[in-house]
């Protein structure tokens, strides 16, 4: 590969999965805190190595469950959380120091993180032993989802305040997971997914730098969240390209030479928009290929969708079957024994180079137009205003 030695060092994963498998982190949350807690306990018993909490829309938008605005949405797309006591019940019988936790929350991220920290302190845990990730990616809410509360400037300030708190108090916590997943689900291409994700990340680093935060340290607490879509080889190449692009951004734009800061650590979820409501058994084949692409792309953690998610939240049986897909790849395929097994493929290398070039050009275009914050303010990059492919199909 024609890369500089610094970028090449972080592009490659020296051991890949030989010494440590990816985290099998199944996204879950529904109905009530007690039912969600039972699902988490079941998943942990079945072998997941990390939990990922889905919150319902009222929680995402800052409404209590008894608010009139919450009517019809309570527990529908995730677990409803209104009080610190709800968080306490949600993690009943779960050792917070032994489980890495991902919280998919953005507009109300500071509130939910405060609830979780309060619980940890109540149970006597040391904050520096807590491991987890807060999504905290407000920019993509304006671009792809629409679940924001405040105007963009104060919202970005809240996000930046969380960076500072986590840097000082939660050293093993990722203070943001910059998310391309939702951008892809809203109808973007693979190129746009990476370009807007990294343009958002640049905006966050610039905001943190302006606030006096140590961005070299911050880059070690940034993770990413990508989509694994239907084009198998494109997705593998996309994940590989992401590592190289991020390394160059950190090193060349922000002049950070620390190799750890240049690492692109990312979670992958299979593409919900590719699932069909008809012949749902075929969805298992789809998610298997998408999970395999994530593995060959070197993901740090993976969520595999249940085959019934085109119809509803996954049943416990289908959630378990989805987890088993990852476990079969991990323990029965032999793939983890090899480092970057398709890395020398001319197809993959050419696609990786092509994606890297196109994404870099797109990022430059976004920045030349004033950056993400300006494009959001003038309505240039709002994807959620258009129906996604899944919405059109339904």
Regions found by a protein language model. Give the residues of each.
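Single conserved hydrophobic/aromatic residue that forms the stacking wall/gate
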Residues: 2-7, 11, 384-394
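Catalytic alpha/beta active-site cores
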Residues: 1, 5-229, 234-235, 253-256, ...
């Amino acid at each position: 590969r024609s890369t500089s030695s610094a970028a090449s060092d972080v592009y490659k994963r020296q051991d890949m999965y030989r010494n440590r498998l990816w985290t099998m982190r199944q996204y879950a949350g529904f109905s009530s805190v007690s039912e969600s807690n039972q699902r988490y306990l079941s998943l942990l018993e079945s072998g997941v190595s990390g939990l990922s909490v889905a919150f319902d829309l009222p929680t995402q938008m800052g409404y209590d469950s008894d608010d009139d605005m919450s009517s019809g949405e309570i527990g529908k797309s995730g677990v409803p959380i209104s009080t610190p006591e709800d968080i306490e019940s949600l993690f009943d019988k779960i050792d917070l120091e032994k489980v890495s936790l991902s919280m998919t929350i953005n507009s109300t991220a500071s509130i939910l993180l405060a609830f979780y920290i309060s619980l940890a302190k109540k149970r006597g845990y040391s904050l520096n032993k807590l491991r987890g990730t807060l999504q905290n990616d407000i920019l993509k809410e304006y671009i792809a989802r629409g679940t924001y509360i405040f105007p963009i400037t104060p919202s970005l300030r809240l996000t930046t305040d969380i960076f500072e708190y986590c840097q000082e108090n939660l050293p093993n916590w990722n203070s943001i997971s910059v998310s391309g997943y939702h951008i892809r689900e809203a109808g973007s291409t693979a190129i746009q997914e990476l370009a807007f994700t990294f343009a958002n990340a640049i905006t966050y680093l610039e905001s943190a730098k302006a606030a006096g935060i140590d961005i070299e340290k911050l880059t070690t607490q940034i993770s990413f969240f990508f989509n694994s879509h239907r084009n198998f080889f494109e997705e593998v190449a996309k994940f590989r390209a992401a590592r190289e692009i991020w390394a160059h951004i950190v090193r060349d734009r922000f002049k950070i030479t620390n190799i750890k800061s240049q690492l692109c650590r990312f979670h992958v979820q299979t593409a919900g928009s590719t699932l069909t409501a008809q012949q749902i058994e075929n969805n298992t084949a789809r998610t298997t290929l998408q999970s395999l692409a994530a593995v060959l792309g070197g993901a740090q953690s993976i969520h595999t969708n249940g085959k019934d998610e085109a119809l509803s939240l996954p049943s416990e049986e289908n959630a378990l079957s989805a987890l088993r897909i990852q476990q079969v790849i991990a323990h029965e395929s032999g793939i983890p024994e090899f480092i970057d097994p398709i890395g020398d493929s001319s197809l993959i290398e050419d696609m990786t180079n092509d994606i890297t070039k196109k994404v870099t050009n797109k990022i430059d275009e976004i920045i030349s137009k004033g950056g993400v914050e300006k494009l959001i303010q003038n309505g240039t990059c709002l994807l959620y205003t258009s129906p996604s492919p899944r919405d059109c199909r339904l």
